[in-house]
Amino acid sequence: MHKDLEAFVSKQNLFVKDDRILLALSGGADSVVLATLMLECGYRFSAAHCNFHLRGKESMRDEAFVRAWAKEHDVELFVKDFDTFGYMQQKKISLEMAARELRYSWFEELIADKGFDYLATAHHADDSAETFFINLLRGTGIAGLHGILPKSGHIVRPLLFATRKRIVEFAKQRNIAFVEDSTNSQTKFLRNKIRHQLFPLLREIAPSFDETIAKNIERLRETEMVYSQVIRQLQNELLSEQNGVLFLQIADLLRQKPKRILLYEILSQYGFNESNCNDILSA
């Protein structure tokens, strides 16, 4: 996997060996394998572990494991405790969203304070496929069908080339220890339902499902790039600004096909929804 990691990092222009990386280390198979590969490939990184205190003794077990791993491998480690339930209630958001906001807010602080170049997360090919189906079900449009991007600003995902199965097999072959999150097997969350119920069925129907979905996601990612370029070009032709006021050339818009989706793509960035755009076209 070392050569595949280095090839993926190079192909996607994620980072170089002189860059300082902050690696999100949960203690699970994905992040421990990524940390092991990064270490053995000679990349410079420190690790960051979030303790959300959502799973009682299991949360403390994870933190102890990560601390021991970092000490054994002489890797600088940052650990942060969070009152996730309190934050959730304060912000009136879901528990999942609360953990996400707390996690990335702290990561951004570390990057700014410690001078890291990139944040590396251990998302893999299965995560990307799950995200594709979640967005498909939610109706996010073409922008949501590219799965998880290898690079988003200074967030990089070097393990996207590998499936979960391959990661776990590598860990077992190398006797790499990791911890299991018991909530990953629960199917009350949409992502877990897709992982444990939908994907096994799709693999039974199409044994090459993992390879096929990965290729299709890559094609959709490239298609979206072309799509976005065309939208930007048309937006520049149809929108103008005078004294801080935006003007849309309706007559020119009406000559475009399909005008509905074009209008939505132009105006959605200003807070307009699909219903607003339909009202404009029917006025």
Regions found by a protein language model. Name each.
Residues 93-94, 140, 162, 189, ...:
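Short coil/turn linker and secondary-structure boundary residues
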Residues 142, 207, 211, 226-229:
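Charged, solvent-exposed alpha-helical segments that act as regulatory interaction surfaces
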Residues 184-189, 210-221:
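Internal, active-site/partner-interface "lid" segment
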Residues 195-213:
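Conserved anion/nucleotide-ligand pocket segment
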